[in-house]
Amino acid sequence: MTIRVLLADDQALLRGTFRMLFDSTDDMETVGEASNGQEALELARAERPHVVLMDIRMPEMDGLDATRLISESEDLSAVKVLILTTFEDDEHVAEALRAGASGFLGKGARPEELLDAVRTIAAGEALLSPSATRALIKRFLAQPDPCPADVHERLECLTRRERDVVGLAALGLSNDEIAEQLFVSPLTAKTHVNRAMTKLAARDRAQLVVIAYQCGLVSPAAESGPSPASE
């Protein structure tokens, strides 16, 4: 599958650089360029990209508002947003995930890291750079959001293994890495993630990460991962 990428950044030079990178990659193509959030929303509807590479600070409509409108549009449910920005602070990371972004990466990332990030997002997984993960932890420790009552009730439906998997996913681990931590197959890890998403009514893996932090399923002390539990 060729991954269709839409670029949204107010700097034409950066868009040109990204276009050359994606168009020179066998499994990707650039389907459009937007210089502000409004253009990004319109092009997302017109081109139906798999991934929108979104800057935060843009004129007319910023990247967070554009991301929120894309994620709330039923006709754009298949479109994933990867935030690429210089602002990897705690508030921006939290707001981006609340808006519906599937990933968050700093502009200092190497080209191969960006390409891998786009592939990860297109495959339906969430992605946070290590610094973004630390910022998210800091944000929820300093000013934790209350766990919504309906979500708190759904947490009771999670098995111990599903709680383990959600916690590891919130730390940024892929299905393969979760499988290695818990000594299960990647398919089993993916199944547990999908079941947890269904039980918690999470629209995607990124929202699952937000729920994990809001409801205390992950903390800095969990960096080494939970101990293996029985299937």
What are these regions (language model features)?
Residues V93-R98, G103, G108-R160, Q214-P220:
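Short, flexible helix-to-coil linker/hinge segments that flank and couple to helix-turn-helix
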Residues E42, L64-S77:
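Short amphipathic alpha-helix used as the core "switch/output" element in two-component signaling
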Residues E47-L53:
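Active-site beta3 strand of CheY-like receiver
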Residues M58:
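Receiver (REC) domain active-site loop signature in two-component systems and cognate sites
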Residues A40, M197-E231:
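Basic, Lys/Arg-enriched C-terminal extension of HTH/homeodomain DNA-binding domains
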Residues N36-E39, M61-R68, E88:
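Acidic catalytic/metal-coordinating carboxylates
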Residues D9, D55, T85:
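Active-site residues of response regulator receiver
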Residues G172-Q207:
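Recognition helix of helix-turn-helix DNA-binding domains
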